[in-house]
Amino acid sequence: MSRPRKRWRDVDGVFLLDKPQGMSSNDIMQKVKRLFQANKAGHTGALDPLATGMLPICLGEATKFSQFLLDADKRYLVTAKLGERTDTSDAEGQVVETREVHVETPQILTALEQFRGDILQVPTMFSALKHNGKPLYEYARQGITVEREARPITIFELNFIEYHAPFLTLEVHCSKGTYIRTLVDDLGEVLGCGAHVTMLRRTAVADYPVAEMMPINELQLLAESFPLSELDRLLLPTDTAVSKLPALHLDVEQSKAIGFGQRVKFANEQQLSGQVRLFSAENLFLGVALIDGNIIRPQRLITQSA
């Protein structure tokens, strides 16, 4: 007798996954999607298979706002091994160079200074960035090196945690587009000994609370033991993906017009500009709009349930 087919459903919100080591971000996202039986899912910035930690999974209408989390600041805890460079700049790659380590803590503290603030970083060849429509890692696996332009990034904080040679642990608060593997590789070159990542854990995305993260095995157990309604209680509201934007509450007529995708005039007593979160008179999240003087221009709107 065949198993009953799983019924997929519309479910909206953000699930804070504590990603396990050894799985790709896409594979683990698909598993979360299946457990919630969600029609639609998307993650908010890939973590390497080696990495663990916070991976917000957007379900349903929340996928419309995943770009805001892709663009958000991130925090990481990283351990590097000095004295070895690998082709991927992490422990999953092949060692391509070995050097002796004659590095003391004061040298590390001095070297860290040049990586703080606004810097330029050349992305690793083992990345999903595309060249002529093809991911760089595909070229790298064929032994081909493609010239990459340095990209501007910001390292807001780069904190020394501990050093027990040859292992160095750092805490990083960085902008979007930062490759921690490249940061470690570049630091190793400044120190003159080379380095690669042996442990990487993302500890924060935007302002999401670490305490709300859940490992996939716990979610699996809940899915096997409780109805979907209990799983839905784990989801954070869709508007948390855009929580850094100022909020604008509309009246009934304004909400109706916005719902039809129309531009709306308003008094703009708060002197708002740029992007805002829109809420109805009943405090329902409507989506994101752009404020242009006293005009509200809808950009991404929630499809309201009938």
Curated annotation (Swiss-Prot):
Q: Which reaction does it catalyse?
A: uridine(55) in tRNA = pseudouridine(55) in tRNA
- Protein family per UniProt: Belongs to the pseudouridine synthase TruB family. Type 1 subfamily.
> Which GO terms label this protein's molecular function in UniProt?
RNA binding; tRNA pseudouridine(55) synthase activity
Name the enzyme's class.
isomerase
The positions flagged as active site in the entry are D48
Where on the tree of life does the source sit, at the highest rank?
Answer: Bacteria
Name of the featured protein: tRNA pseudouridine synthase B
What stretches pass through the bilayer?
A: none
Question: Gene3D superfamilies recorded for this chain?
Answer: Pseudouridine synthase (3.30.2350.10), PUA domain (2.30.130.10)
- Entries under PANTHER family matching the protein: PSEUDOURIDYLATE SYNTHASE TRUB1 (PTHR13767:SF2), TRNA-PSEUDOURIDINE SYNTHASE (PTHR13767)
Q: Which CDD domains match?
A: PseudoU_synth_EcTruB (cd02573), PUA_TruB_bacterial (cd21152)
What's a GO biological-process term for it?
mRNA pseudouridine synthesis
> InterPro entries, from UniProt?
PsdUridine_synth_cat_dom_sf (IPR020103), PsdUridine_synth_N (IPR002501), PUA-like_sf (IPR015947), PUA_sf (IPR036974), tRNA_psdUridine_synth_TruB (IPR014780), tRNA_sdUridine_synth_fam1_C (IPR015240), TruB_C (IPR032819)
